[in-house]
Every structure is written in C-alpha cells, then in structure tokens.
C-alpha cells in the first residue's frame, strides 16, 4: 500500500493525504509504481519552494502519462469513492470530493521531474 502522502504529512488535511494514498495505491497495484501520477501546478510549486508552505491550494493537479491509466481512473474512481462525483473530460478526469477537487491531466508539456522528500514526484517549474 502506498502511504507517502500520509507518512510525510504532505498536506495538513489528513483526508486529502488518505485520498491520494488510496489513488496512488490503486494505480501502483494495477500498473506499477513507475506509472504513478506526477504532481503539477501550484502544489508542485509549493513542493519546489516557489510558493510558501502556507499556500492554500484550490485543487490538486496531477499528470497521468498513460492513456490506459486515464481509462482506469474513469472506471475505478466512482467505485473507490462512491460518495464523490467524477467528471470525465477529453483532457482530464476530475474527482470532486466534499473538500477539494483532484484533477488528473493528460500530459501537455515535458518538464523535469523532482522528488518531494525523495518520495513524491512533481514537475519542476
């Protein structure tokens, strides 16, 4: 089971850490850890130190490089989180929780990748 978000307390909201660990675990189990999402957007900028640790994200942006994983998320997110809403768009899959939106984007740009606390991968801006 993937537990990096919870064990590192990446976010102050334990619910969010648990959601992300659950999603990453499902992907790692089905496709392997080399296929895990890459954190991007404002949260990646916080991880990189561009934004303050006090920055309050309005959503969590993740890049999924494989179209197969996009299809998997379209089908599995409603089963994993039945109380939440999932919206499928051509460029992304969005999980609307009661407290934040988690967006799974198709890749559009190639960026260098770094590792937050040597564990969670994110795009460098």
Please describe what each predicted stretch is:
Residues 1-39:
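Helical scaffold of the NTase/Pol beta-like nucleotidyltransferase catalytic core
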Residues 24-60, 65-70:
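Active-site nucleotide-donor binding segment shared across nucleotidyl transfer reactions
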Residues 66-81:
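Amphipathic alpha-helical segments
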Residues 16-18, 39-44, 81-84:
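A short linear-motif detector with a strong N-terminal bias
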Residues 15-17, 54-59, 82, 107-109:
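Generic detector of bulky aromatic hydrophobic side chains
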Residues 77-119:
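Conserved catalytic core of two-metal-ion nucleotidyltransferases
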Residues 119-125:
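NUDIX/MutT-family hydrolases
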